[in-house]
Swiss-Prot record:
The gene is selenon. It comes from Xenopus tropicalis (Western clawed frog). This is Selenoprotein N. Residues 1-30 are annotated as: Disordered. The keyword DNA-binding does not apply. It is found in: Endoplasmic reticulum membrane. Glycans are attached at residues 163, 310, 457, 503. One of its GO terms (molecular function) is oxidoreductase activity. One of its GO terms (cellular component) is endoplasmic reticulum membrane. Keywords: Endoplasmic reticulum, Glycoprotein, Membrane, Oxidoreductase, Selenocysteine, Transmembrane, Transmembrane helix. Residues 1-10 have a biased composition (Basic residues). The keyword Ribonucleoprotein does not apply. Plays an important role in cell protection against oxidative stress and in the regulation of redox-related calcium homeostasis. Regulates the calcium level of the ER by protecting the calcium pump ATP2A2 against the oxidoreductase ERO1A-mediated oxidative damage. Acts as a modulator of ryanodine receptor (RyR) activity. Plays an important role in muscle development and differentiation during early development. The chain crosses the membrane at residues 40-60.
Amino acid sequence: MSADLRKRKKDTTADNDAPQEAQAEEENKKEKPSSCRYRFLWKLLLGLLLIALLFGIKIHRDNELVRQQEAALRTLGAEGLFLFSSLDTDNDMHISPEEFKPISEKLTGISTTSDYEEEELLDPNGETLSVASRFQPLLMETMTKSKDGFLGITHSALSGLRNWTTPVVPNNVFYAGQFKAFLPPKNKLEVGNPWWIIPSELSIFTGYLPNNRIYPPPPKGKEVIIHKLLSMFHPRPFIKTRFAPQGSVACIRAISDFYYDIVFRIHAEFQLNEPPNFPFWFSPGQFTGNIVISKDAAHVRHFKLFVPNNRTLNVDMEWLYGASESSNMEVDIGYLPQMEIESLGPSIPSTIYDENGNIMESRNAEGEAIEFVFEDINWQSEMTFEEAARKLEVTMYPFKRVSYYPFPEAFDRALAEKKLVHSVLLWGALDDQSCUGSGRTLRETVLESLPVLALLNESFISTWSLVKELEELQSNKDSYATFASLHLEKYNFPVEMMICLPNGTVVHHINANYFLDITSLKPDEVETNLFSFSDGVEDLSTVTYIKFLKEGLEKAKPFLHS
């Protein structure tokens, strides 16, 4: 009985509590949105305050930096500030010991050990490779400015160029393991499959690196061996060029059981002047070459690196006349007869053992060096050096997916295939780093556009030529001299694009500067009747170049059918 009574009381209490809990829960639900809203507003307010604080700190730091730069300008002058800025690589307006090191080495004549090294430690007992550098200075008379005796050019501007007559390190010794950077990645082990040793970080969209620099940044990783090699020529090599395409690319030319023959192409440049003179940039068209190396990088059979000298001009030069990036700049091009590094023989063990495991002297009783006999390499799969170099060229320059033939051959092919000639005439090579500014823009934009490539491949034979080469060809007495004269009559600095008949007649042409001007218009400035955005092509430069090519085809019809 008493138990039933307790149960009824408990049930009554539970029934009374249920409405109260429901009521409390309902009130909490009403309060919860309001509470969440307040918490959200507080978080938003705190976030905005934090952003404002960070923005204020940035403004303060920027103002402080401007104040320091203005004070430095008053103290040092423009040229002094330029020298200071060239050393201040992190732009904090303070020179650290590491940043001061180039000046210290210059004043004391003592080069300290570099902090940077390969990512992997080298085997001190590994094989060593002896190499020699060969260098013949640029022929000053090949520069355009030489025609008027370098009128208006200060002696100090060219001092670094004039004084560079020999390599700074004629001979050097490397560990074979240092050349491991040239080995292919695991997914590029086939003949003719290119890979990037040092990737390019620039494009037409990212712009270019500053001109007003004196000293190169410390190399990292795979850049180290290339930096050390090029430092044999000059103490200030820049492994990352100012203009695209940067970097180094390679592919396997041949494979055997134990060796690769690897062809490579390197884009690098040098800054020749020393403070207080302003920078002078020396940009060879390219470094190319090959290395025969064991698959484990323990042995190097052969190594050669060189600047091709088969063209009449192969080096671009640019120098500043002021301390800022906007200062006046002179540009010229010239011919470099020789710039190469070659191994003096295969790599050899640093320690020599006899058949009993005893260490031997490196020279015999007569004092002559012990000669090593190396087995012949039987290549199982291979291509020619030229074929491999072509693969690398297309990797660096996608516009070369269309073949560009030598000037005479282009007209012979056009006659045989009944096509027109698409010709680009300029004063720096279109397919290397000696190219001029507007030529660079063309090859990195419109000439590599897929619609343009398709039309060129279908209806034209393409060629590009140096002005200097056609001037020399013009002086000959063969039929191509007339073709050269017809080209030069239409040429305007710096680049002229032409459409020609197989007999050399120029039926249509456009200057690169004019082309770039009209294709840089804003969309609302473009006359709709001037351009037709058909076939799904919306890029103005591509549309304009296709229009130029089609106009050439149209203008050639009366001549082709006559």
